[in-house]
Amino acid sequence: MISSFHRPTVARVNLQAIKENVASVQKHIPLGVKTYAVVKADAYGHGAVQVSKALLPQVDGYCVSNLDEALQLRQAGIDKEILILGVLLPNELKLAITRQVTVTVASLEWLAMAKQEWPDLKGLKVHIKIDSGMGRIGLRSVTEVDNLIAGLKSMGAEVEGIFTHFATADEADDTKFNQQLQFFKKLIAGLEDKPRLVHASNSATSIWHSDTIFNAVRLGIVSYGLNPSGSDLSLPFPLQEALSLESSLVHVKMISAGDTVGYGATYTAKKSEYVGTVPIGYADGWTRNMQGFSVLVDGQFCEIIGRVSMDQLTIRLPKAYPLGTKVTLIGSNQQKNISTTDIANYRNTINYEVLCLLSDRIPRIY
């Protein structure tokens, strides 16, 4: 979708807050540990290029989801290491080697395919993924990893790192976390040829399990000022939420008792009341199930009434406000605040998803 600069709906991204959040985590982890900024999914909706440039002096590299995200950073002039966390099939390796993008290898099947499709891996930097219990991608045994490392090196690749990902690092019950940690430690200890970089710490592990950090961390959601657990665990230090979302009233009217609002006529006024229309809808990532939630106008919580439409939503107002009056959907308005986690709790989802669903139709202002 094209970014809509000619309407009042915008996301404001505080890059200084992101820099300070990363600095706060770095103070909390052991000295000498490398920091990778996770900027996949357009930096969780904050803008991958802008965030990466802002963090350039603070981090050692970046993590993305796929090759296209890596190339976007290279084209923007980012010259530090970029690690693709997902699997890149061997038919795309030429571009990864040319643009000096580090790839994740997660199986011996990948190695066999590479031997057929791109046997010369000279110039390719690799991190090996271990499935310690997440159940998505990765190898599960010392023998497999030893064979993979030997095979990759014989084809000319540099095996720089090895890593895993925890499924429950953001939960109070650490049983599964400890099982995964012990599995990973045992596997690493059994390797004949251990890669230089070992990393297992995502945002949650970095802040709640800092004693388990190896020699690199991957900082994602905490960089953007959000609690990885939502509301389940307390943060050990304060973070600044970096993104706010705002719009304006574009239509205000009074309706009478018995009048309905929105598709399906799901809202019926019980008395005369003022209704405001705001130009944001589910095409922007403000999902239909937000009916009944509130936004902030003039420091007051105003309920979303009627179904959220593709491009608009309607709110109940305490009085008639002029067109152009500010509407806050995420962030502060006259000492009142709506957080991304508040929205996630209402939707019965996670704060990550709320941010990632904000579409590129909403301009990001820095």
Curated annotation (Swiss-Prot):
It catalyses: L-alanine = D-alanine. PANTHER family: ALANINE RACEMASE, ALANINE RACEMASE, CATABOLIC-RELATED. Belongs to the alanine racemase family. One of its GO terms (molecular function) is alanine racemase activity. Catalyzes the interconversion of L-alanine and D-alanine. May also act on other amino acids. HAMAP family: Ala_racemase (MF_01201). Substrate binds at R136, M310. It is an enzyme of class 5 (isomerase). NCBIfam families: alr. The active site is at K40, Y263. This is Alanine racemase. One of its GO terms (cellular component) is cytosol. Its EC number is 5.1.1.1. It comes from the Bacteria. The lineage of its organism: Bacteria, Bacillati, Bacillota, Bacilli, Lactobacillales. SUPFAM superfamilies: Alanine racemase C-terminal domain-like (SSF50621), PLP-binding barrel (SSF51419). SMART domains: Ala_racemase_C. Its cofactor is pyridoxal 5'-phosphate. InterPro entries: Ala_racemase, Ala_racemase/Decarboxylase_C, Ala_racemase_C, Ala_racemase_N, Ala_racemase_pyridoxalP-BS, PLP-binding_barrel. It comes from Streptococcus pyogenes serotype M4 (strain MGAS10750). Pathway: Amino-acid biosynthesis; D-alanine biosynthesis; D-alanine from L-alanine: step 1/1. GO terms for biological process: D-alanine biosynthetic process; peptidoglycan biosynthetic process. The modification N6-(pyridoxal phosphate)lysine is found at K40. Keywords: Isomerase, Pyridoxal phosphate.
